Design a protein with these regions (language model features):
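Conserved class I S-adenosyl-L-methionine
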Residues: 1-40, 43-52, 55, 135-159
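Class I SAM-dependent methyltransferase SAM/SAH-binding core
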Residues: 53-96
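A conserved beta-strand element that flanks and buttresses the S-adenosyl-L-methionine
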Residues: 108
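A short glycine-rich, Lys/Arg-flanked "PGG" loop and its adjoining helix->strand segment in the class I
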Residues: 120-132
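A C-terminal cap/extension of S-adenosyl-L-methionine-dependent methyltransferases
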Residues: 151-153, 184-234
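Acceptor-substrate binding/catalytic loop of class I
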Residues: 154-171
Length: 234
């Protein structure tokens, strides 16, 4: 792993969280979809890898999950410890998790896998600390989406300092299946869909729009994908 590259990523996130705070991220409501997809229970022990300021952990904590988070950014860790005081928040590298084997029922990584310097090592670590019948949920960026194509390939706005990257649907499937995961379900990112359907009157939305839905376009064109996974050996 390139230490210099890792330090640049840490510095970028420290500056971003220090100056933008929670405004850098989607709102808390957007994280409700991950709670539903995982079907979280109060008995679950949850690890949020690259937890940021703790938006997902806050929701998990409210249903009495045992919550743990880790992030490389000191600014993010300070925010998370203040925002979710009931969670156990660690400063550390997601590619070398400081937790015992078989520790967690649920492992999530929301919008961060594509930023890891050593993706395979990060995935191996998440498998190591997860229990035998654990659930995994990852939000990852799609390199085939129209937005990515315009911003990154045409306008060249890719944030290389923050190690911003993406993969196609087939590439992500290959990454997960070749690194010890079974893919249970794949959904499009729910937040853009939630914003669109929010204009539909509530009484209609409640009857016609499912809480977790498959979008209006073929999955491969989604801006981001949500993967629900398990270990390959379970």
């Amino acid at each position: 792993m390139s230490l210099n590259k890792q330090n640049k990523i840490i510095n970028w996130f420290d500056k971003t969280y220090k100056h933008k705070g929670f405004s850098y991220l989607r709102p808390s409501k957007a994280y409700e979809a991950f709670i539903k997809i995982l079907d979280l229970k109060s008995s679950d022990s949850v690890l949020d890898v690259a937890c940021g300021p703790g938006l997902f952990l806050d929701l998990a904590n409210k249903i009495d999950c045992k919550c743990t988070g880790i992030d490389v950014s000191l600014e993010a860790v300070k925010m998370a410890r203040k925002y979710v005081p009931g969670s156990d928040i660690h400063l550390g590298n997601s590619e070398n998790l400081p937790f015992a084997d078989n520790s967690f029922d649920v492992v999530v990584c929301i919008g961060a896998l594509e930023r890891f310097v050593d993706l395979e090592q990060a995935l191996a670590q998440q498998l190591r600390v997860a229990k035998e019948n654990s659930r995994f949920c990852f939000l990852v960026r799609n390199s085939s989406s129209l937005l990515w194509t315009i911003n990154m390939k045409i306008l060249r706005r890719q944030n290389k300092t923050g190690h911003q990257d993406a993969k196609s649907l087939d590439q992500w499937i290959y990454v997960f299946e070749s690194n010890g995961f079974n893919i249970k379900k794949i959904f499009p990112d729910q937040w853009p869909l939630q914003k669109i359907t929010s204009f539909i009157p509530f009484f209609i939305r409640r009857r016609l729009v499912p809480s977790i839905h498959n979008g209006f376009l073929p999955l491969r064109f989604a801006g981001e994908f949500i993967f629900l996974l398990s270990r390959k050996d379970t």
